[in-house]
Amino acid sequence: MSTNDSTELLFTAVYESDEDAVVGLLRSGADPESVDEDGQTALYLAAVSDQPDIVRLLLAAGAAPDRLSSGSDAPLCGAACGGHTEVVRALLAAGAGPDTVEGFGFTALAWALRCGHVAVTEALLAGGADPDRPGPTGEPPLVAAARRGSPGCVRALLAHGARARSESLAEARRWLVLDVEAELRASLEQAYGADRDFVTHRYPQDGGDIVEVQLLDPKGNPVAGNDQQTGHAEIAGLLEAALAGS
């Protein structure tokens, strides 16, 4: 079997979540660090596809946990962005750097906080992620969690001694008086133009709600979206208590 053939078969097996095929291909000499024609690594594909068992197989066969896919995408960051907690734990257990920086300055913790993934945030902090390492725009993680509106992420950061508590309290209070739906819609209009159709959804999450605003095309299909949690009142209480006890 040629290298090209084994690479193609390995990626097909990962796409199809076929663990037995992955095992067979690796035993037959397929490179666990194979990349496709776009430069994507097999490990990154498995990580963002939430396939922890295949991630473990590739790591055990020698895939480097921190190797960037397509030159800029870290497997740990991809898993964190998707909320794939078990994959995050597998990568950390294999030696992935908890503060590895990928393209545009993102770390896995920055992605987890931006998306409000509490379990991933807890796993990263338990794995050694710096609770005070600034995100890509230079803001402290606690401020990012307060803006997101995720009480669970704020609790996790406070439990690990995160600083910038006064700034985070100010951010939580700022969002308390804002119309979350209107803010999300405005950000989409700024990016895609005004006079567009939108639809809003609300879902329970993290003891509160998550507000999702989607931009629709002329046929009514969603083409872009943004979301935000609404736990800012609870977050303000958590931060007030933390400041009072410090």
Regions found by a protein language model. Name each.
Residues 1-9, 155-246:
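Ankyrin-repeat-protein effector appendages
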Residues 21, 53-54, 86-87, 119-120, ...:
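Conserved ankyrin/ankyrin-like repeat signature
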